[in-house]
Amino acid sequence: RETLQHLGLPAAGSLEEAAAQIRAQRFSYMPLEVLSPRLRDLIDLRPVFGLRSPVHSFSRMINPFSAPTMMMGIFHRGFMDIHAGAARILGQPRMAVFRGEGGEIERRPNKPTQVWITEGDAEPLVETWPALLDDPHQPADGAMDLHEIERVWRGDSEHAYAVASVVGTIAVTLRTMGKAASVAEAESLASGIWAARNRQFLGVAA
């Protein structure tokens, strides 16, 4: 939330505010305690249990605006079939699940990535996407400088790992949406989207 606030993209305080943000800037972040205070309370029991509960997993399956495409990042690769199966049971039109950076919806560009894509109740499409970078090591980021995000977005910083992560994640999303017929086409389209981005967007939002 601190990062979004820094970038001029404050969290939504209600469903109505989230909808307005999506209409205005095609992006919104709504905290779980706003979407479902009860689920937030259950997650906050983690210190009591001493471990995560299934609530952490199924909370990610919530789709409050009935988006036709969902993206799911997980940490443990052995659970991809479970999440794909849940999407089919819930009738989610399209969903992708993959092992993301730190369990987030963020493709790791320095490693091959297995992606499970579901469409309705059909059997999942399982693809292994190649690494986008030759160096298998992720560069350390001890400073966690929020201004670096702006510099990368505006093209003022040549951060190969960050750009590859963004473009790679966009590519998986495009493939999941049915906008690309292959991994190669998805990555080409994603590169074009990144190159054509509005580099002043974050400044305007702030």
What function would you assign to each model-found segment?
Residues 5-12, 17, 22-206:
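Glycine-rich anion-binding loops and their surrounding alpha/beta cores
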